[in-house]
Amino acid sequence: MQSKLLLSTKLTSQGKTQLDQYFVSPPFKVMTLPAYDDAWQNGLNAMQMSSSPGLLASDLLDIEISLADDTALSLNTQAFTRVQSMNEGDYATQKTCIKLGKNSRLFYLPHPLVLHKDSSFKQTTEIEMSEQSELIYGEIVAIGRVLNGERFAFRHFASYLRISYQNRPIIADRIQWLPAKMALTSLSQMEDFSHQGSLTYVNLAKNAVEIKAMVSELQALAAEQKNMLIGVSQLNEGGLMVRVLAHRADIIQHLFERIGQVLKAQSNIV
């Protein structure tokens, strides 16, 4: 299965964000949602949907998202993405390419990825920022169907995230898990946790002092959480990263949604 999702935004004469170009092939669908009380006023809320029960060997998901200048998009997904069992040497792939226009804002939080027994999955995400643009991007992955006794029973998981501005990298984050060759339950790895989440925030309009204050606020929020291991780090330039280890996907999802609202409220783009 080769599936494509292409989505772009435009700004109406009333200053509201709408879908512009929109193309999907099965099993993808996109549904726009009613406006709700949000710090990003006049933004577009949408849900990325899929009718697939999961990814199989040789499946390729190709996602392209482009935001026009001065537009704002909050994009969520409908359900977990499951990578099904496959023969040794096979794998499924997802490629995501995102481009943010000047003064645009994107909050993209897909549901968790679940790695079934004997599965292999490779994903790359490349995001190009523009002047004064703002990004909140999250990823959550589960090491298997833990309630079925699957812990690190998958074969391979590889994830590469690159965020750049004017062809200059702001952050590059790579995860490579090979359970048969790596001690992934050791100290400083996953230990006894079953879910990992990463949330990256980049706002090129913020200076280092402002970002440091936001890091302190999120560290205080993290200190209130239970049954999670949370770290908040300031990037070298214009942003921060939150990394979480937990025993359930939903608590990471809810935490990231809460952090997203905190970060949106501090946006300096109206």
UniProtKB/Swiss-Prot annotation:
Gene Ontology, cellular component aspect? cytoplasm
Which Pfam families does the UniProt record give?
UreD
**Protein name per its UniProtKB record:** Urease accessory protein UreD
Q: Tell me the keywords, alphabetical order.
A: Chaperone, Cytoplasm, Nickel insertion
**Tree of life domain:** Bacteria
Biological function: Required for maturation of urease via the functional incorporation of the urease nickel metallocenter.
Q: Where in the cell is it found?
A: Cytoplasm
Picking any one GO molecular function of the record gives: nickel cation binding
Please report the organism this UniProt entry assigns to the protein: Actinobacillus pleuropneumoniae serotype 7 (strain AP76)
Task: Tell me its family.
Answer: Belongs to the UreD family.
Q: Which HAMAP family match?
A: UreD (MF_01384)
The record describes its quaternary structure and partners as: UreD, UreF and UreG form a complex that acts as a GTP-hydrolysis-dependent molecular chaperone, activating the urease apoprotein by helping to assemble the nickel containing metallocenter of UreC. The UreE protein probably delivers the nickel.
Recite the lineage of the species: Bacteria, Pseudomonadati, Pseudomonadota, Gammaproteobacteria, Pasteurellales
